[in-house]
Amino acid sequence: MDRGLPGPATPAVTPQPPARPQDDEEAAAPHAAAGPDGQLGTVEQRLEPAKRAAHNIHKRLQACLQGQSGADMDKRVKKLPLMALSTTMAESFKELDPDSSMGKALEMSCAIQNQLARILAEFEMTLERDVLQPLSRLSEEELPAILKHKKSLQKLVSDWNTLKSRLSQATKNSGSSQGLGGSPGSHSHTTMANKVETLKEEEEELKRKVEQCRDEYLADLYHFVTKEDSYANYFIRLLEIQADYHRRSLSSLDTALAELRENHGQADHSPSMTATHFPRVYGVSLATHLQELGREIALPIEACVMMLLSEGMKEEGLFRLAAGASVLKRLKQTMASDPHSLEEFCSDPHAVAGALKSYLRELPEPLMTFDLYDDWMRAASLKEPGARLQALQEVCSRLPPENLSNLRYLMKFLARLAEEQEVNKMTPSNIAIVLGPNLLWPPEKEGDQAQLDAASVSSIQVVGVVEALIQSADTLFPGDINFNVSGLFSAVTLQDTVSDRLASEELPSTAVPTPATTPAPAPAPAPAPAPALASAATKERTESEVPPRPASPKVTRSPPETAAPVEDMARRSTGSLAAAVETASGRQALVVGKPSPYMFECITENFSIDPARTLMVGDRLETDILFGHRCGMTTVLTLTGVSRLEEAQAYLAAGQHDLVPHYYVESIADLTEGLED
C-alpha cells in the first residue's frame, strides 16, 4: 500500500429528513406574525394618522376655550372676557343718565353681554364633555394602547426570528458533529443535543407568545374598525354644538337689537331680523297659542310653574313682590324666542311669577272666560259652602276644553303653593287677591261711567271664586297631575329641590341705612317688619351672592330736606295702595324691594333723594314720602307687585292690612294715574 500525502477529506453527508408541512408553516410564520395583511393592513396604516389628528385637534380646540377648563358654571362665567365686559358696562352706565339714549343702549348691551357669556360658558362645557374629553381618551388612551400592542408584537416576532436562527444553527452544528465521527453517546454530542432541545422549547414558548400577542393586536384592529364611525361623530357633534351656540347667540342678539331699535324709533329692515319668525306667546288667545305650538298647556304657564316648583315654592311673597322691569321683559322675550334658554331665570322666582301673571293678564279673554263671568259671580254669591262648591263645579264643566285644562293645571299648582304658606306667607286668600284679577275680569263696556265702582265690587267676588277654586282644587279637579306635561322640562321633586335658603333668614337689625347728607332722627319703637319687608330684604342679600344681573337704574332728583319729627305719633297705618307701611319718626322712608315700573315712576317723580345716590332695583334708602297726602310722618315703605287697579282694589276690599294698609288719599283715583293696563 502506497503511503503518500493524504488526499482531501470527504465530508460526511448527514441524511436530512424529508421536509414536513409544519416546517413550511414555521418558515412562513415570521412573515404572518409580523402584522395583518389585506384590509386589516390598510386599517393598521390609519392608526398613527388618527392618533396624530386626535391629538392635534384636541390641542387646538383646547386653545379655543375662553373659560377656565374643567371649572363649574359660575367660576367659568366669571373668567370669561364677555362677563368682564358686562361688568364694566354695568359700572359705566351707573354714571350716565339712564333716560339718555347712551344710557339705555349701554344698559341693554350690559344685559346681552351677560347673557352671551352664559351661553358661551354652556357651549364650552358641552364642548368639553362631548368632544374634547372623547378626543383626549382616543389620542391618549385608546389608540396608544393599540400601537403598544403592535410594538410588543414586533419585538416578539424579532426575538422569535433570532431564536429560530440560533436553533437552526445549533441543529446544523449538532449534525456536523455527528458527521465528523462523534459518537452518539459522547459528551460533546450530548451537550449539543441538550442545547438543541432547550432552544426548541424556548422557540415553542416564544411562538405561543407571538400568536397570543398577534390575536390581541388583531382584536384591537377589529375594535378600531367598528368604532371608526363613532370617532367620526366627535367632529359631527362639534359642528352641532357650534351651530346651537351660534343660533342661541343670534337669537339673543336679535331680541336685544329689536328692543334697542324700537326704543330709538328706528325700524329694522335687516333680512336676518325680518326672516326670523317666533311663535306668538303673549297677547294672543289661548286657543291660537296652543294650536300654533301644538301644546295642551300654554308654554308660559307650564314653563313658569316648572321653574317655580324647582326654585320658588318657599319664596316669601311669591306673586306679590315685583321683579325688576328689565329682567321681566327679557324673560318674556326669551319665552317667545328661545324657551330652551330659561335656566338663568330660575334663580329669580319673582321674575318667573311676574311672567306668569303677565301672561294671564295679557290674554285677550280671561282664562275663566267672559261668557261665564256672570255664572262665576252667581256661584261666588252663594253663602252655603256645599251649594257654592256644586255651582263652581258646574261652571267649570262648561269651560272650553283648553281653558279647563289650563285652569286645572294652574289651580293644582296654586294649591301646592298654598301648602307652603307657613314659609311663603301665601295663603289661598293672599294668592287669590294677587292672581284673581288676572284670571277673571268683566267685559269692557264703552261709555259705562260706573265701571270703576263695579270693578271694585267684582274684584271682591273674583277673589272669593279663585280662593274657593284653590281650596277645593282636589275636589273640583280630581286626580293627580304631571306638571311636566310636554316633557320639555326637567322633572322636579318638590321636597328635594325647593330651596329654603330664604325661609331661614331674618331681616338684620342694621338694615336701615342713614344718608350722610341727612341726619337721622331718633326713631320711635316700631312694630316688627311686615312679611313683604322681610322678604325683600332677604332677597336682596341673596341676590348679592349670585352673579350680578344688570338692574334698571333710575337717577333721582333734588336732595331731601330735613324735616322735624312728627308730633302725633299715634297715627298708624299710612302707606300706598302698593306698599306695606309702618310708622316710625320724622319724614324719612325706607324703600326696600324691587319696584314695578309704576312704583319707579312714583318714587322718581314724588320722592326727594340725594342726587349723589342712584336708585337701583333692590336698593334700600331713606327718603321723604311726598305723594298722596303729605302725611308728615315717617314710614317704612316696602314695594309690592301690584300693577293693576283691580289688584289694588282687591287688596283694599279684602282688608289685608298686613299687606296693604289704607293710605290717606281722597280716592283710589289719586293713585291710579300711572297704573299700567
UniProtKB/Swiss-Prot annotation:
Range of residues in the leader sequence: none
Subcellular location, principal: membrane
Feature: compositional bias, Low complexity: 1-13, 29-39
Mediates non-covalent binding of poly-ubiquitin chains: annotated segments: 574-677
GO CC terms in record: cytosol; plasma membrane
Tissue-specificity statement: Expressed in brain (at protein level).
Biological processes per GO annotation: negative regulation of small GTPase mediated signal transduction; positive regulation of GTPase activity; regulation of actin cytoskeleton organization; regulation of Rac protein signal transduction; signal transduction
Disordered: annotated span: 1-39, 168-190, 504-577
Pfam families on file: BAR, Hydrolase_like, RhoGAP
Domain (Rho-GAP) ranges: 284-477
Membrane topology: Peripheral membrane protein
Keywords: Cell membrane, Cytoplasm, GTPase activation, Membrane, Phosphoprotein
Key word Cell membrane present: yes
Domain BAR: 25-270
Subcellular localization(s) per the UniProt record: Cell membrane; Cytoplasm, Cytosol
Pro residues bias spans: 516-530
Site (Arginine finger): R320
Keyword Transmembrane: no
GO MF terms, alphabetically ordered: GTPase activator activity; linear polyubiquitin binding
Family annotation (PROSITE patterns): BAR, RHOGAP
Protein task: GTPase activating protein (GAP) which specifically converts GTP-bound RAC1 and CDC42 in their inactive GDP-bound form.
Protein's UniProt name: Bargin
Species the sequence originates in: Homo sapiens (Human)
Gene designation: BARGIN
